[in-house]
Structure formats: C-alpha cells, structure tokens
C-alpha cells in the first residue's frame, strides 16, 4: 500500500486527507477531484510521506468517535451540522454553521483527548439563516381540552 487517500465532501466542498509518496501524486489527485462535476472547492491536506499504519488510522477513528460524542453532549450545538474527519491527530471539521456554533464546536473539539490540532472548514451562515433551516417546533397539545358534545 503506497497511497492512502480519504475523500470527504460537505456541501460541495471536498477535503482530501491521507498520504501519498510524491508531490506529483498529490497534484494528480487534486487535479482529478477539481474536475468533478459539482465540486465547488478542494481543500488539499494530503501529506507527502509514507502511508500511516493501520493502528494509527484506528486511533484516528477513535478520536473522531470521541469528538462526535462530545459534540452530541454539548447542549448548544446540533451535532448533525458537523462533519468530522481525524487524520494523524488533526481534526478537520466541516459544516454550515453560525460563527457562534463554529467557535463553540472548536472549543469542544480542542478539549478532546488525542486532538493535536483543529482545522476549521466551515461555511459561516447568519443566525437568521440558521433559524430558517430549523423547522419550527410542533404546537403544544392541549391536554385539558375535551371534545364538545
């Protein structure tokens, strides 16, 4: 195994992580992804280095799981708004979120054991845009109301 490439997409932004043997391989992969239909932008985080071990990748998966659990536990964040990838102890975080959510999520992730660095790849939206994305809560049921005879 000479190449290890992860392709993660969120809202037409593509994140490339992993390891390739040469700069030429790195540029070839980026060029291929940039030509794909509906790709708005490519974030190239491919490292020119030997491929990481299976145990290193497994450790990254554990860290990603811890991050997701921490986002779920956070009361002021909607965990599904974030896509998280961990590669070599660097957490890459994608999402369409408000500045408040981006800052809060970054603080949560920085405190997760095993995270050495956080790379923010957010599309920042306004609080008003967020309100428009979230469906209104259903009206409360009137338990005391009885059908009229």
What are the language-model segments listed below?
Residues 1-149:
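N-terminal targeting leaders
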